[in-house]
Amino acid sequence: MTQNRISRRQWLKQAAGFLALVPAASATLEAALFRRGALLTDPQKTYLNLFPSDPTKYRFTLEQDVLLEEIERTSFGYFWEQAHPDTGLVKDRNLASGPDERNVASIAATGFGLTALCIAHQRGWQDPLQIVQRVKNTLRFAFTRLPHQHGFLWHFMNMGNGQRAFQSEVSSIDTAIFLCGALACRAYFDDAEIQDLAGRLYQRADWNWLVRGEKTIAMGWTPENGFLRTRWDSYSELMMLPLLALGSPTHPLPPEIWDAWARPNFEFDNIRYIGAHAPLFVHQYSHAWFDFRNVRDRHADYFTNSIIATKVHKIWCLELASQFPDYTDDLWGITASDSPHGYVAWGGPPQMGPIDGSVVPCATGGSLPFMPEETMRVLQTVREKYGARAWQRYGYVDAFNPLTNWYSQDVLGIDAGITLLMAENARSGFVWDHFMKNPEVQHGMSHAGFHAVEASEAHPRPIPEFKSAATNRN
């Protein structure tokens, strides 16, 4: 939740709704936004990734691993301290310096929090019995007391009683993030009640209700206006949605749902990839749980696609160094976050929002498995160079601007969550290894047509490097 009560997905939904209502504006905006990044003219021809994902795990240095441990552990502190002890609902945002009086939770932050509890239990950061009890409290409350529509949950709610907050929608993607957290717990904890509750929550979700004769999944529903007009019909963080729906043992959707969403082809500096008019997080979220390494469907190798998209994002940031000289090889990364003027869904390419030289740590934190060496350099720089201004009780502040000396006062649950989960995946593959043990997850990916990447499908080629003029600037 933001200072003006709008989330990243709500911002994108509103933008999508505006463009859907005003086609001429959509065309004009597309032309204005793309500048050097261009949408390829044949959207039906899906790009075959030329850089197959590498199964070799990056080896972090001891110094890097110590920092990652610190990042993860402090991020976990958010999910432990800013969750209601009885309901388990995790606060949407909180002061970076410590507890505050806000009481609005987000169901997505709660899903990240459930997964964080698995990681903390495995790494010994908190009493294991207390962790198990917190997981049980969360799943019990969600199943027995949290209001729902056909198994789908409010985006935002009061963390003490679960009642709807801010007139928010019943959100398909945020419920999916919660269900991913629940299924991670089911796979990790050897506890009959946890496994039963997580399974029931997943089985309760009626995916057919979200489709209702359409080819794609609805973004959400409100009692005032029914289903939102915008749908999950183009590449974004959506992949977890159809995969969970395909694997459902109770309300499955047909395999056609996987092919129904568009996969637009983008090109930047002669590098092609599947992209979106959206910030960098769309290339991260589904990858936090689903292991797309070394597998592909008939369209693409999505893990490699995220590597390319992240590489392109870095190049784009460095090309902005003439305007924002703090952007270097050691400091880059923008995604939806706080800004001095409220919450902004910014990033690129193509440019979204009023880029002003800000840095968003979860942009690189959430990209750790894709570019471990290069993202670690950024995280180390922020920790060492900007100190207590950019690093507080729960780790990195949500965003900061070294050019204007502005620092966000808050931490967002989903931003701390994506950093924590992807850091652990980059270090050990822990979340992937456990989440993928769920048979429904395997069935979903099988129904979507995923198979191992074959040598004949890959034609390796170096991804172009870019060095900014300010690369070594101190």
Language-model regions: role of each:
Residues 1-6:
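Secretory targeting signals
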Residues 32-40:
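Cleaved targeting-peptide boundary
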